[in-house]
Swiss-Prot record:
InterPro entries xrefs: ATP_syn_F0_a_bact/chloroplast, ATP_synth_F0_asu, ATP_synth_F0_asu_AS, F0_ATP_A_sf
Entries under Gene3D superfamilies matching the protein: ATP synthase, F0 complex, subunit A (1.20.120.220)
Compartmental location: Cell inner membrane
Organism, as annotated: Helicobacter acinonychis (strain Sheeba)
Function of the molecule: Key component of the proton channel; it plays a direct role in the translocation of protons across the membrane.
Protein name (record): ATP synthase subunit a
Length: 226
């Protein structure tokens, strides 16, 4: 990509895909190391990183149980929690000058959206059975089924677009906002913009996690879904 903003990955290659992949891997390594540090020497009375992580887990489960129930919230936490944490770290790494958010690349957010899309359909089919699961797409009124079924199919595929573009658009916009602020005031650290981007990064990770649980609830809760 021409006129790309310089990042630390440019020391190795200027290829767009390489740069995105570099920060995807770097974010994963950082998340793993920080999570490892939080889980080592676990204490009955949590302190430091352990306390932060336990607070995050409790907050996620508290919100998720209102969507899908406590049992299923815990069951699907490994997926939803990991995605939320990874999206958060991906968003935060872009705040650092000369670093780039993996979530500022649509190809990466598309992969995340596809993971959620295929997984919740897999779970819906596994829990309800193939025919019963897709029968819900036709709606309760039989004569409307020929109209409702294709509408539902389009609706589900549109979730891929909405999930990926929402995250990509917000983070890309945040990165451009930060770049402009740094160009305008290069000798003064723009504290306010950094704080705005920090909270926006948390918000986008939260939204992605919530939508993951919402889609799973719609797929596996036979009494309340669809």
């Amino acid at each position: 990509m021409e006129h790309r903003v310089f990042t630390v990955a440019n020391f190795f290659s200027s290829n767009h895909d390489f740069i995105t992949g570099f920060f995807v891997v770097l974010t994963a390594v950082l998340m793993f190391l920080i999570s490892l540090g939080a889980s080592r020497k676990m204490q009955m009375v949590p302190m430091g990183l352990q306390n932060v992580y336990e607070s995050i887990i409790s907050a996620i489960l508290s919100v998720a149980k209102d969507i899908i129930g406590e049992e299923l919230a815990r069951k699907y936490f490994p997926l939803a929690g990991t995605i939320a944490l990874y999206v958060f770290f991906s968003n935060m790494i872009g705040i650092i000058p000369s670093f780039e958010s993996p979530t500022a690349s649509w190809s990466f957010t598309l992969v995340l959206a596809l993971i959620v899309f295929f997984y919740y359909h897999f779970e819906g089919i596994r829990v309800q059975g193939f025919f019963k699961y897709f029968a819900h797409f036709a709606g309760p009124v039989k004569w409307l089924a020929p109209f409702m079924f294709p509408i539902e199919i389009i609706s589900h595929f549109s979730r891929i677009v909405s999930l990926s573009f929402r995250l990509f658009g917000n983070i890309k916009g945040d990165d451009m906002f930060l770049l402009i602020m740094l160009l305008l005031v290069p000798w003064v650290i723009p504290v306010a913009p950094f704080m705005v981007l920090f909270f926006m990064g948390i918000l986008q990770a939260f939204v992605f996690m919530i939508l993951t649980y919402v889609y799973l609830a719609g797929a596996v809760l036979t009494d309340e879904g669809h």
